[in-house]
Amino acid sequence: MALFLFLAPLEAVDYTQKTEVKKFMQTMQHRYGFKKKTLQKWFKRVRKSSRAPRIKRGRLRGGGRCYSSGSWDRYSFQFLKRAGGGSYFMHKFRSTLNRASKKYGVPEEYITAIIGIESNYGVMRGNYFVFDRLTHLSFDNNHRRAKFYRTQLIALLRLSAREKINPKEIRGSSSGAIGLAQFIPSTYKAFAVDFNKDGKKQMNNVTDAIGSIAHYLKKNGWKKNEDVAVSVRYDGQRFNALPTGYIHTYYRKNLEGIEPREKFNYRGKVSLLKLEKNSYDELWYGGKNFYVITRYNQSSYYAMAVHQLAQKIKKSYAKRYGKK
């Protein structure tokens, strides 16, 4: 199937005369050793799209935010249909996923699910020039998160120097996330690994992306062989008895009338996770590993989508290829 990409027209803008950019270039020159001539070349022609999307704060971030009826159905639909592609991806890169799972203790299906949600297994990595987008977000229109995006721009330039790549050629999402794992530059710098041992950490390389995701989860507290979440029973159709979301935790013995639907291999405090469907609320327990997934994206719905997609991928894989 032919895939046609219609890109927004780009105009080249000179940022070198902006006061804040001049200060930024001086910082990069004196603190990090970048050449003045090189910096001026990069900032002289910043490609700017007239149709680039505004960066909005996610509505599903945090643990205690209220959702609307049916919000889980709408949110999950776009991701849970990717199980077939996930089982194929897991089969194709089985040896690499197995090696990452053994080294970091993260199940193969969870690594695969994150790649599936973040980039649809590499198909949707983003087609924006990351340097240009971060420059725009850092220095235009008094963006409320300008300071954050400047730290990302610094990280991008430093990692491009370390990996010996041209920062002007790196493509990613409209907010600067890169590769199959959709790491922002600071995350890339902190958690990317050279999993194929070629001397480079490349997020557009499948092997490095797989290893880096597993490494990220491990460093954020993933516990091997510990269950992530389980569906629970409760009385009624809508649950409002207690605060829900990953930021609230409870001892299970204090949650009267709430029972797991199946065995849950986790003994610590749990979160109550409410998924608002059209006609009722699904309620789940979430353990420490569920919380770890929210470190990748601070949304209970995101982490639950990862968990449920991982389980669907595991079942699809067993059906198509047999058990691992």
Regions found by a protein language model. Name each.
Residues 1-171, 186-324:
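Cell-wall glycan-active module
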Residues 172-186:
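Extracytoplasmic ligand-binding site segments that recognize negatively charged/polar headgroups
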